[in-house]
Amino acid sequence: MTKTVGVLSATLLILSVTAAFAGENPLLGTWKLKAFVREVAATGERYDERGEHRNGFLGYASDGRMYAIITWDNRANPHDVVPTNEERIKLYGTMISYAGTYTMDAEKVIHHVDISWNQIWTGTDQVRFYKLEGNLLTITSAPNRNPVDGREGRSILVWERVAPP
């Protein structure tokens, strides 16, 4: 009887801690991109290669799944629903998107990528450090090689929480 009560107590404790963490996950929801800055490691140079009117959404769900999609400013529309090869290259080169699962602690979230616009990211873990201030979420990548220009550095993204409809 004592053993059963002990096992039951331990199980309830684990479930309550898990439920409490799930209820307190500050990243849950949808976020809209407000700023995207790239910082070059060698020089400290900071630049925004995505344009003034950046587009992007980031989502974290309670089931542990996430997605990110970002497009550059002023993307050209293809001339037809079936783009030319040149149009495809330009469209591919002006976006970042991936989805997968995530794990987190008090300072970082790790995106475990299941599917990606660039197959080389699929199956990788993308480490992101985060900071919350009100409805703003700042995410800074771990040092990495930029998939657009190849330079080493980090990305600093500011997201604003999207209110439910």
Give the positions of each predicted feature.
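Lipid interaction determinants
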Residues: 15, 19-165
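Bacterial N-terminal signal peptides that target proteins for export
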Residues: 1-10
